[in-house]
Each structure stands twice: as structure tokens, then as C-alpha cells.
Amino acid sequence: MTTNIVVKLQFEALHNWPGVVNMLPDQPWIHMLKDKHRHIFYITLEKGVTHSDRDVEIILFKQSVVSHLETRFGRPGDLGALSCEMLAEYLLREYNCESAEVLEDNENGA
């Protein structure tokens, strides 16, 4: 049996998609994504544990993720051209997680 801990957090940050005009030239209404814009990123991480007696303390794990994001990207964050997919992949690698979900404004994402 596999057991995971789950943490959920929110991270306010800016990002942009510089390549949107070239990628979607026939969709001018979405070209505004080339400029920095703000989101609340809703992040959910699942991390595997080896036993059920606080192998990884959930509160400390969440605090470490929040602290890392603020140190790496600032507060509010500036993610540059990172997409939800890229941020999810980054967090998967950084924390050796089983899964990562990153949603813009708790609506759409990866």
C-alpha cells in the first residue's frame, strides 16, 4: 500500500507567455498573455511517505514549500514565462512528489 501526504497552498504571482503571438497568431484576443499578469496559483502536492507516523510532518512540509517559493520567486512571485505545467514539473522535481497540481485562480492549470 502506498501512502501520500497532501498539502494545498496558494501563491500570488505574475507570469507571462512571450510566445503567444507566434503560437496563436489568429487569436488576437489572447495576445494579452504576452504581458505580465497576476494570478493566485492554487498548488496541491502529494508526497509519498514510508510510514504513517509523520514520516514527513505535513505542516513543516507545507511551510518549506511556501518559504521556498517566496525565496526563489519573491513575494508576490514573479514566475517570468513559467506556465502552470512548468511550475508543476519544477515542484515535482524539487520535492520528489508523486503528483503536483497548479491551477490559475483555482480554475485552469496542470
Spans of features found by a protein language model:
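Charge-rich, low-complexity N-terminal segments
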Residues: 1-110
